[in-house]
Amino acid sequence: MALRRPMVAGNWKMNGSAALAQELFKKFASKLQNDSAEVVLCPPSIYLESVRQLLEANKEALDGSLVRMGAQNLSQHDFGAYTGEVSGQMLKDCGCRYVIIGHSERRRMYGETSNIVAEKFAAAQKHGLTPILCVGESGPAREARRTFEVIAEELDIVIQKNGTMAFDNAIIAYEPLWAVGTGKSATPEQAQEVHAFIRKRLSEVSPFIGENIRILYGGSVTPSNAADLFAQPDVDGGLIGGASLNSTEFLSLCTIAMSA
């Protein structure tokens, strides 16, 4: 069985501040002292440089731990007249290692189709970034027993446009839309069922990818439910929203992942 290092990725969305970043790093420096889990901070783009500077300033204190920086979105284009957009190369220049692709809020609020998501996935990898690909079903889709169908479609478009081996450098985050930002989390059993399906789906085209890819759960993860979620055999950590804005809760989630 593959040894997949757990990951806790904090998606601040359009929240947070430079002060929050400083508070997080102060706690990281004193309490985050091993590399059994990878921690990724995904602040708004305006704060990427602040986080990069904090990573550099705390390099010695964080020695032995794995704290990385990621972005919440990128353009599928390399450059051009795309006002307000940020390219993969720009994120790489800022020090990002990861970028969230296809978050449900981007799909729903900004009309990002699965084809656009697949293009952004490719753009991230072109510039040396690891995409964190979000997939998940709506409440009505789950009630209609279409969860697997929806997720298969979202995965298959990325595979068709980028090839199976593109997932050798990717993370998948399962985020049921009915749980994102609602305070209602999937049960550990529900999460495991979907994660196992995703792993099996990828294993059908590449056993190596299926066994080794990390699959995160995202959807109202808190310190009270994280241990049970992270204990599931196919759950490799979490994509954290609201709890990532509370330094105490986020550090608790990191600690739970380290012992998962």
Curated annotation (Swiss-Prot):
Instruction: Supply the source organism for this entry.
Output: Shewanella oneidensis (strain ATCC 700550 / JCM 31522 / CIP 106686 / LMG 19005 / NCIMB 14063 / MR-1)
**Which Pfam families does the entry link to?**
TIM
Q: What does this protein do?
A: Involved in the gluconeogenesis. Catalyzes stereospecifically the conversion of dihydroxyacetone phosphate (DHAP) to D-glyceraldehyde-3-phosphate (G3P).
Q: Which reaction does it catalyse?
A: D-glyceraldehyde 3-phosphate = dihydroxyacetone phosphate
Per the record, the domain of life is Bacteria
User: What lineage, starting at the top, does this entry show?
Assistant: Bacteria, Pseudomonadati, Pseudomonadota, Gammaproteobacteria, Alteromonadales
Pathway(s) it belongs to: Carbohydrate biosynthesis; gluconeogenesis; Carbohydrate degradation; glycolysis; D-glyceraldehyde 3-phosphate from glycerone phosphate: step 1/1
Q: What is this protein called?
A: Triosephosphate isomerase
Named from the GO MF annotations, one term is: triose-phosphate isomerase activity
What cellular component terms from Gene Ontology apply here? cytosol
InterPro entries in the record, alphabetically?
A: Aldolase_TIM, TIM_sf, TrioseP_Isoase_bac/euk, Triosephosphate_isomerase, Triosephosphate_isomerase_AS
Q: What is its main location?
A: cytoplasm
Which GO biological process categories is it annotated with? gluconeogenesis; glyceraldehyde-3-phosphate biosynthetic process; glycerol catabolic process; glycolytic process
On whether Isomerase is a keyword of this UniProt record, the answer is yes
Q: Which family does it belong to?
A: Belongs to the triosephosphate isomerase family.
- Is-annotated flag, keyword Cytoplasm? yes
Main EC class of this protein? Answer: isomerase
- E.C. numbers: 5.3.1.1
Q: Where is the active site?
A: H103, E175
Q: Which residues bind substrate?
A: N11, W12, K13, G181, S220, G241, G242
Its assembly, as annotated, is: Homodimer.
Keywords of this protein's UniProt record, alphabetized? Cytoplasm, Gluconeogenesis, Glycolysis, Isomerase
Q: Where in the cell is it found?
A: Cytoplasm
